[in-house]
Regions:
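Extracellular, surface-exposed repeat/solenoid domains
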Residues: 1-26
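Hydrophobic beta-strand residues in large extracellular and virion-surface proteins
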Residues: 23, 210-212, 271, 295
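Outer membrane beta-barrel translocator domains of Type V secretion systems
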Residues: 26-226, 343-345, 350-359
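Outer membrane beta-barrel transmembrane domains
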Residues: 160-163, 238, 245, 254-360
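Short acidic/polar capping segments at secondary-structure boundaries
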Residues: 185-189, 240-246
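Intrinsically disordered, low-complexity Ser/Thr- and acidic-rich flexible linkers and loops
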Residues: 223-228, 283-285
Length: 360
């Protein structure tokens, strides 16, 4: 029997209570105790939480994940022009546990975003502002298992986002020096959850996410290889603040349980440093071709834990207050018409939290 945040089973009493039958939600007591560390949590709590986390995080992006400006020839006039159109694909896998350790959740996601500048202006010199629009689609599929009961639940969230971004470079030609990037997106999502032996539930979530990011890049040295290729070494400290305001609608399950989301309004902080080597191959002279392998290390902090209240009983995601991240990849200009960049990212937190993703 599922009620509130817990699963209950019918069991015979012991000792003097052998002739009585009880609904229990604990290994050690014959009567349920309202304590998430003693009672048997429903796996659906993990699925509700995962959907909320995915809706708040799947469209979070960084400047270098959508950076690039390429040249093309106008088909009508034949004149060379520049375009800032970009597209990013990301796939990821995530694992985490709840605060009691009873629920284990894993999920897989896919996200596509695209956008481009709609205006640019400068204040003289090489500095320049970029104003752009972006939109995206993403989905996340998850499974949660309850360690004590062996019950499982599955969930999914599918959604769209649209928003604006603005970026300033102190040097728009080389992207050295300081930069400032900000964006805001509105997202709306369809959610589903299905527990073992229970009717499926559906609800919607929606809300705003916004970001402010800054950094400073400088060249700390250069060296030549034995083949005469020039290598330039860069370092860039970065900082980013993301406000996450996607909130799920209240839901009454078929059994009457009230489902409320928690954790919206979380402020996600990222502090880190990126270093890369820009390789200028002698064979590519005059071909506008260059490659930059990079490594990035970040510390991530969240001010709130995402979770759910089921008839007022809280269940939350654990291990995400402080997360370490390592990211490596390559950014390259194939020719004047095409830039490509890709990376692999690993995040590790407390209590078994981890996330792995790849982006192109």
């Amino acid at each position: 029997i599922a009620a509130g945040a817990y699963d209950y089973t019918l069991g015979r009493g012991t000792g003097a209570n052998h002739g009585n039958w009880y609904l229990t939600s604990s290994k050690n007591t014959s009567m349920p105790e309202q304590d998430v560390h003693n009672n048997d949590l429903r796996p659906e709590a993990g699925t509700y939480t995962t959907n909320l986390v995915a809706a708040n995080t799947m469209f979070v992006t960084r400047l270098h994940e959508r950076l690039g400006q390429t040249q093309y020839v106008d088909a009508i006039t034949g004149e060379p022009k520049a375009t800032s159109m970009w597209m990013r694909h990301e796939g990821g896998h995530n694992r985490w546990r709840d605060g009691s350790g009873q629920l284990k959740t894993q999920s897989n996601r896919y996200v596509i975003q695209l956008g481009g500048d709609i205006a640019q202006w400068d204040w003289g010199g090489t500095n320049r502002w970029h104003l752009g629009v972006m939109a995206g689609y993403g989905n996340n599929h998850s499974s949660t298992g309850a360690v004590r009961t062996g019950y499982h639940s599955k969930g999914s969230v599918n959604g769209y986002s649209t928003g604006l971004y603005a970026t300033w470079y102190a040097d728009d030609e080389t992207h050295n020096g300081a930069y400032l990037d900000t964006w805001a997106q509105y997202g709306w999502f369809d959610n589903h959850v299905k527990g073992d032996g229970l009717p499926g539930e559906s609800w919607k979530s929606k809300g705003l996410t916004a970001s402010l990011e800054t950094g400073y890049a400088w060249k700390i040295g250069e060296f030549s290889s034995n083949y005469g290729n020039l290598n330039e070494w860069y370092v860039q400290p970065q900082a980013q603040l993301v406000w996450m305001g996607v909130k799920a609608d209240e839901l009454y399950e078929s059994n009457g349980t009230l489902i409320e989301s928690t954790g919206d309004g979380n402020v996600h902080t990222r502090l880190g440093v990126k270093t890369w080597i820009k390789r200028l191959n002698k064979m590519d002279d005059g071909k506008s071709r260059e490659f930059s392998p990079f490594v990035e290390v970040n510390w991530l902090h969240n001010t709130r834990d995402f979770g759910v209240r089921m008839n007022g009983e809280p269940v939350y995601q654990d291990g995400t207050r402080n997360i370490g991240e390592v990211k490596t990849g390559v950014e390259g200009q194939i020719n004047p018409h095409l830039n490509l960049w890709g990376n692999v990212r690993v995040q590790v937190g407390d209590k078994g939290y981890n996330d792995t993703s790849a982006m192109l």
